[in-house]
Amino acid sequence: MTPNTKIFTDLLRESRAFLTVSAAEYGAGHNAAEAFRILPDSMLGVLVCHCETVSCAGDLLHLYGGGQLFARNTKDNKPFSELLFLGDLADGGLFAVSRIDTAIAKRGEILFLSPGALNFEPMGIDTAEFIRWALESREETLKGVWLTGEILSPCALKKHITAKLDLLDRLDMLKTEGDA
């Protein structure tokens, strides 16, 4: 695991802003649905517990819910179609969970879960640069992510990420000075 990945993994755990699932836990292909059924402590585990059916088609995990669990839009009637969740693979790589089509409302809060498709995309880019990109392009849609009953506001999320970015910048500066 590279230093950047280690820092980013710590960020995932500390901020509770993103989902962390190992490759061994989520499986692949048709095994993914069953793998998620036994993850009670993860967001997708909670999601599966509240879904009527789970199925896989290629790299897409389809989750179908019913009743009053699912809300088509947020309280201000804006759909969460551009949300992005991240995970850490066993080998230190990253994957993105995108296409969050629908939010689920519970206890008056919005949970970023989906009865649509979750697309698992391997990420092969630098961790620090990705965090910077996430802050710049996703700040408007990162309204807070529910993982263990906690909603993290965009302000709190940015505070956590900014602290880690500052650390990365200091590490880069020290490395540059050491090379000089």
Predicted regions and their residues:
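A surface-exposed partner-binding patch
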Residues: 1-102, 164-180
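Solvent-exposed, non-transmembrane amphipathic alpha-helical segments
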Residues: 64-67, 106, 130, 147-154, ...
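Glycine-rich, flexible loop segments associated with nucleotide phosphate handling
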Residues: 81, 107-109, 153-157
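Compact, glycine/acidic-enriched structural inserts
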Residues: 106-144
